[in-house]
Amino acid sequence: MKQLFAAILCLCLLAGCGRTDSTGNTCRAEESSGDGDVPGKTEETGADAGGELFRIIRSQDGAAPLLLAKESGGPGDVYTLSPTTVEPTLDGRSTAAMDLVYTPGTLLEITYGSVLETYPGQLAEVTAVNIRSDGFDDRCALYLRVLNDLWAVDEGLNSDITMLSVDLSQTGLSDSEQAAVAWAFGGEHGISQVLSLNYEQLAAEGYLTGADPDSDGMPCWEDGCLFTITEQETGDNELNGARNTVTFDAQKWRSALGAYFFTDCTASRDAQGHWGDYTVGAAAIS
């Protein structure tokens, strides 16, 4: 009888060990959903998720909440960090006596326990925030300025849109940085439906009218506007954004007869990674 009882107990323990915890994965809303917060839902990231690197894309007057892009992340790796009771460190040293400013372009090393299921995802259960003095690069802030300048010129092209697409695929930004810039740009102008598609993809997915080769009409996006930044290639066939000077073209497109262009734009960064103002070689309208 004792042997039978012991065998039953072992089977019960094995059954318990075989269960998979349903909170074992990081959850985030899909980029294309456009949904806001999904209250009350979190998923654990796992103990090994601590100390991950994120780049600040946008801050509110140098303070939290921060919009972050996970370093070398995918389109869904866009997050926010709200004020916490955790005292940040600077390269591992205390910042108690410092007047901290969170500057876009700065790298943060963040240890956290879970992510709220929203888009952008909200980092939660944060136990450590380490501000890195190395790796600074605020090219995302540069391209946000370019996009906002494009928005402001010939504003009739985008004054009545309900959606937009931002194509940064031909820049040196990571997928997560591209998605974060697009989301921030749309939010600044009250556009909740933000895509990251190029012209061909918009046409293929049916957003454009008159784009079919057999159509007699003129290509047009009736409800939206496409914003594109394209870095020019260097002689070795690499995008020159990886260097200290970048040359690029930028445009917004509503239709074949409704577009605005910045061409041969140039910008440079200093030794600390700060990108300065850019110059426009020429502007054109169609």
PLM regions with names:
Residues 113-119:
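Short, charged beta-turn/beta-strand-edge "cap" motif at the junction between a beta-strand
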Residues 13-16:
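C-terminal motif of bacterial Sec signal peptides marking the signal peptidase cleavage site
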Residues 18, 24, 28-35, 40-44, ...:
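Flexible low-complexity loop/turn motifs enriched in small/helix-breaking residues
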